[in-house]
């Protein structure tokens, strides 16, 4: 019982303690809430005071700023007012100055008007006097004309006609003299200008010249090789001659074989073939055929390369490949001993240099000059002259009309229609006529000189004649008692016509007719 009572008392104490603890916690919580409330109220009050202070300071700053802005605005307005007053003052001064000038001009204008009125009055007076004098002059003139008509027996119209005829004849005579002087001066200046242009072009053009012949010589390592070239019963040499179209001359010339033929391309093929056969050592018909074919291909490559080199050397581009190949073939063509490709390159350079001096298209002049003899590449294969063939080739491969005309007219067969064609004619003549450019056989050269002198001697009144300058000039002495000064021009013209009709010659021939009269007296 005691234990139970003890436990009951213990539980009661615990319950009381718990209740007391709860009550204490509630009281403490309420006090905490009240404390925080008071603290918050205190903070709110402090914040309100701070806000009021900040607002007050802001109002003070705003007032100060307002006063400052107002002050600056007043100063700016004051400055603007001063500036405006200054400008107004300047404008007023300017207006006053202009008004003064206007007044001065008005005064000057008034003075001028007054002066003009005085001059007009004086002019009217002078005009009246002049009119009176004019009427008096007309009356005097009528009287003089009537007197002249009475004395001369001619009317006014008849006198005018006579006077006009005299004046017309005099003016015509003076015009003829003036025109003759102008023409002579123009010809002289043109000749000087042309000579300067040609001289400059020739000085700038230094083309190499190689004369070709109709034979080629192939060296042999020894004379035993001649027998191998001939072959058994001559079959090797016959095969070689048949395939190349070239004659092989094997004679007593030591260690050499001569190739003879007028076609340089065939001769070159034969030369290359023979050199390859000699180097190879195997000489028989089958091997000859093989080597001839290789030589043809090699020559064809050489032709194309020579054509390309010519275009590169002259600076002419854009040519059709077939035209380039035909240019290369000119390397193996000659005219009077002058290599045609070298001649064409020289003509292109000369034409280009003269075109540059005259201010015309240099590239077009070079192109026309390079192609002017293109017909000679195939004139032995196609019917017609090289001029006609060349023009047809140029048309076929779409060359310009200027180039076609330059090719067609460079020998005078067709009229030149452009300055380019004229330049090509001149360049062609210069290249062909320069000393050493062309040659001919001794026999034909001597015959040409003899024929030249024979033509000159066939004319009446010719005393003697001499072909000089390698046949490029003939000097004719006439008998002064049989030929007058006026006959000299006729004789020279007739000789020129005979030469042009009866002789073939490169370039041009100068005909120089001389009439010399001597008077001899003796002082005693």
Swiss-Prot record:
Q: SMART domains, alphabetically? A: HDc (SM00471), KH (SM00322)
Coiled-coil residues are none
Membrane topology term reads:
Single-pass membrane protein
Q: Which residues form the KH domain?
A: 214-299
Q: Where is the signal peptide?
A: none
Supply the EC number(s). 3.1.-.-
| A molecular-function term among this protein's GO annotations | RNA binding
BP GO terms, sorted: mRNA catabolic process
Q: GO terms for CC?
A: plasma membrane
PROSITE patterns xref list: HD (PS51831), KH_TYPE_1 (PS50084)
UniProt KW keywords: Cell membrane, Endonuclease, Hydrolase, Membrane, Nuclease, RNA-binding, Transmembrane, Transmembrane helix
Cellular compartments annotated = Cell membrane
Predominant location category: membrane
Start and end residues of each HD domain: 340-433
Transmembrane segment boundaries? 7-27
Q: Which PANTHER family did the record assign?
A: RIBONUCLEASE Y
**Protein family:** Belongs to the RNase Y family.
What does the function comment of this entry state?
Endoribonuclease that initiates mRNA decay.
**Which protein is depicted?**
Ribonuclease Y
Q: Which gene encodes it?
A: rny
């Amino acid at each position: 019982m005691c234990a139970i009572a003890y436990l009951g008392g213990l539980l009661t104490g615990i319950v009381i303690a718990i209740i007391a603890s709860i009550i204490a916690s509630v009281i403490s919580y309420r006090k905490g809430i009240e404390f925080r409330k008071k603290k918050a109220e205190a903070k709110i009050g402090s914040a309100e005071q701070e806000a009021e202070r900040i607002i007050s300071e802001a109002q003070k700053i705003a007032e100060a700023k307002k006063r400052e802005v107002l002050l600056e605005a007043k100063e700016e307005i004051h400055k603007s007012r001063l500036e405006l007053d200054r400008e107004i003052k300047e404008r007023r001064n300017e207006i006053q100055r202009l008004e003064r000038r206007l007044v001065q001009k008005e005064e000057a204008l008034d003075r001028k008007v007054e002066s003009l009125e005085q001059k007009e009055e004086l002019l009217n007076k002078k005009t009246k006097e002049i009119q009176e004098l004019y009427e008096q002059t007309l009356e005097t003139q009528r009287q003089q004309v009537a007197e002249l008509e009475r004395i001369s027996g001619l009317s006014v119209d008849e006198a005018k006609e006579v006077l006009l005829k005299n004046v017309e004849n005099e003016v015509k005579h003076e015009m003829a003299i003036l025109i003759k002087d102008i023409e002579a001066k123009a010809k002289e200046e043109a000749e000087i200008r042309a000579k300067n242009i040609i001289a400059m072009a020739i000085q700038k053009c230094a083309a190499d010249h190689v004369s070709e012949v109709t034979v080629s010589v192939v060296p042999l390592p020894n004379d035993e090789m001649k027998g191998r070239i001939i072959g058994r019963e001559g079959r090797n040499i016959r095969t070689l001659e048949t395939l190349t179209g070239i004659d092989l001359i094997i004679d007593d010339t030591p260690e050499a074989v001569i190739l003879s033929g007028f076609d340089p391309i065939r001769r070159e093929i034969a030369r290359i073939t023979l050199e390859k056969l000699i180097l190879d050592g195997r000489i028989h018909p089958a091997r000859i055929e093989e080597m001839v074919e290789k030589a043809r291909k090699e020559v064809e490559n050489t032709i194309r390369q020579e054509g390309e080199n010519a275009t590169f050397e002259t600076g002419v581009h854009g040519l059709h490949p077939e035209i380039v190949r035909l240019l290369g073939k000119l390397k193996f063509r000659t005219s009077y001993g002058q290599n045609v490709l070298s001649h064409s390159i020289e003509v292109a350079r000369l034409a280009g240099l003269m075109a540059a001096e005259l201010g015309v298209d240099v590239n077009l002049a070079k192109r026309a000059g390079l192609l002017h003899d293109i017909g000679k590449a195939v004139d032995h294969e196609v019917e017609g002259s090289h001029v006609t063939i060349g023009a047809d080739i140029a048309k076929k491969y779409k060359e310009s009309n200027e180039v076609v005309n330059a090719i067609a007219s460079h020998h005078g067969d067709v009229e030149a229609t452009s300055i380019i064609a004229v330049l090509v004619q001149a360049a062609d003549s210069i290249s062909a006529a320069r000393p050493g450019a062309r040659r001919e056989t001794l026999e034909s050269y001597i015959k040409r000189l003899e024929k030249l002198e024979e033509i000159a001697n066939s004319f009446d009144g010719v005393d003697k004649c001499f072909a000089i300058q390698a046949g490029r000039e003939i000097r004719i002495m006439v008998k002064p008692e049989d030929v007058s000064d006026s006959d000299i021009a006729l004789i020279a013209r007739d000789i020129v016509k005979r030469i042009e009709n009866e002789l073939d010659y490169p370039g041009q021939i100068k005909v120089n007719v001389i009439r010399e009269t001597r008077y001899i007296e003796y002082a005693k």
